[in-house]
Swiss-Prot record:
Homotetramer. L-citrulline binds at Y87, S92, N123, R127, S176, S185, E261, Y273. Pathway: Amino-acid biosynthesis; L-arginine biosynthesis; L-arginine from L-ornithine and carbamoyl phosphate: step 2/3. The keyword Nucleotide-binding applies. This is Argininosuccinate synthase. Gene3D superfamilies: Argininosuccinate synthetase, chain A, domain 2, HUPs, Single helix bin. The gene is argG. One of its GO terms (biological process) is urea cycle. Keywords: Amino-acid biosynthesis, Arginine biosynthesis, ATP-binding, Cytoplasm, Ligase, Nucleotide-binding. L-aspartate binds at T119, N123, D124. InterPro entries: Arginosuc_syn_C, Arginosuc_syn_N, Arginosuc_synth, Arginosuc_synth_CS, Arginosuc_synth_type_1_subfam, AS_cat/multimer_dom_body, Rossmann-like_a/b/a_fold. It is an enzyme of class 6 (ligase). GO terms for molecular function: argininosuccinate synthase activity; ATP binding.
Amino acid sequence: MSVDKIVLAYSGGLDTSVILKWLANEYECPVVAYSANIGQIEDWDAVKEKGMATGADKVIVSDLQKEFVEDYIFPAFRASAIYEGTYLLGTSLARPLISKEQVRIAHAEGANAVSHGATGKGNDQVRFELGYIGLDPSLQIIAPWRTWDLNSRTRLEEYAKQHNIPVPTTKKNPYSSDENLLHISFEGGILESPWNEPDPDMFKLTVSPEMAPDKPTYLEITFQNGDPIALDGVAMEPLELFRALNKVAGENAVGRLDLVENRFVGMKSRGVYETPGGTLLYHAHRDLETICLDREVMKIRDSLVPRYAELIYNGFWFSPERELLQMTMDTAQKTVSGVVRMKLYKGNCFSVGRKSDQSLYKEDFATFEADDVYDQGDATGFIRLNGLRLKINALQGK
């Protein structure tokens, strides 16, 4: 099938600018450059201007921030999603949303092909393309990094100069970074050695612990059915609330993470992340669950978290199994409503109080003082029955 029109996921950087020109030349068809605003700091007018100057038939910038928070970040946090026990999935959650909007634009513009700038080594190529396939398998997918011979930065710069594509003359960023409302990631450069400590000047969203306030910051987050709805008693829309969490957590050095993760494509990768608001929200939400979730429900939910997080990390957001797990996670959240008081201090994030009308914590049952609701003698039979199989095993072994 011939390629008649292409929608490119376009950032305005060197890679996707070269791809934009290359697609127009290689396929001799119109290319729509599409940029997703998911909270990154960017001069969108400059992105549009550069895209048109580089050969785009049209440049579209979609503001997806509200949708990102409400339909991607919050559902994942209701599920307490965390990959390999550490990573809060900042990049992984953004990719399916970018893909979804790209497919929508392809339909609106009458394009029969989509393209992206992800390399053949990373997870993002998988995430983008599984999104395309899951939403419209009829679209042709063009992944230049897997087919062309421009396989180094030097060759990209040479191609850019040959085709009058502006190349930044400022000092190059020594890291590869990805930024959105949930986080910013840093990879490559000196970080490729897992022994090298990150440069303190690298961080953008958080202050260093040494520079954080010398007094702790207290705040209260109100939840309803697992979603945050208010900060310090003030009701806010999801986007406004999440920005506020990012600000206060970043000011207190909360959310820095340095890890080595297992990529879906098979290799290990070292990444450094800043996830200020997400880290604060994750810990507050988990704490409220301790009083609102039934023990066995929590056990089942926690057993599903690794699978749920892995699906998102690997790019299966639009899969039936992720949707099934989401319904299960959301059902568990029907009782997770209340208020958590958090204490932030020099990179640390503590829960210091929690309350809920749906709390399963009852002081008259848990008290160490005398009570009239719990017969301690009942524990004798409970222990005897639970120890029966241990007794039988011990006797058998003699």
